[in-house]
């Protein structure tokens, strides 16, 4: 199935709020010929157009192998994570595709949604805040999203910060646990 029209959102602008309407030539020609009128506050605004241009440049630069590169970099980030966690003695597991992996404070992967209980969510939240405190950004669900611009420099960046984040999380959680006992 090929759509007649397609609307693309923020992804095409690398997170900048833009939208793109694209479609079959005969439909899009109606706009150019003046048969269809479209007006809006942000039509052709410079920031949005620049963001879209930058996204397309990045895609073109990595067009041959960007998924393989993302997975390779994320695999290296996982290796650094597990190595640091072992060194610190902090339980971590990684779930889901590497390009949008979730990190949990558990010895092994969660087998069901029931295992993602309040304790795990709380511990994941502490870890997430410690990540952020050390300059490692991740989503509210303790998820790390890859992008095609990641390089081994990002693995090095992660490696310089992850041990401190895990040590801080370990210290905070041990203090909290002592308070619970």
Task: Please report, for each region that a protein language model flagged, where it lies by residue.
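Conserved N-terminal phosphate-binding loop of PLP-dependent enzymes in the Aspartate aminotransferase
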Residues: 1-181
């Amino acid at each position: 199935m090929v759509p007649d029209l397609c609307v693309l959102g923020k992804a095409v602008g690398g997170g900048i709020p833009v939208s793109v309407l694209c479609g079959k030539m005969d439909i899009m020609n109606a706009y150019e010929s003046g048969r269809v009128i479209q007006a809006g506050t942000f039509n052709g605004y410079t920031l949005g157009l620049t963001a879209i241009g930058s996204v397309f440049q990045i895609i073109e630069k990595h067009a041959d192998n960007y998924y393989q590169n993302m997975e390779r970099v994320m695999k290296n980030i996982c290796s650094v994570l597990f190595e640091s966690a072992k060194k610190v003695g902090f339980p971590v597991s990684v779930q889901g595709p590497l390009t949008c992996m979730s990190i949990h404070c558990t010895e092994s992967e969660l087998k069901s949604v029931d295992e993602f209980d309040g304790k795990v969510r709380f511990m994941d939240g502490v870890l997430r805040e410690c990540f952020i405190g050390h300059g490692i950004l991740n989503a509210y669900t303790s998820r790390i999203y890859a992008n095609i611009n990641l390089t081994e420099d990002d693995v090095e960046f992660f490696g310089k910060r992850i041990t401190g984040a895990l040590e801080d999380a370990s210290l905070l959680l041990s203090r909290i646990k002592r308070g619970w006992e």
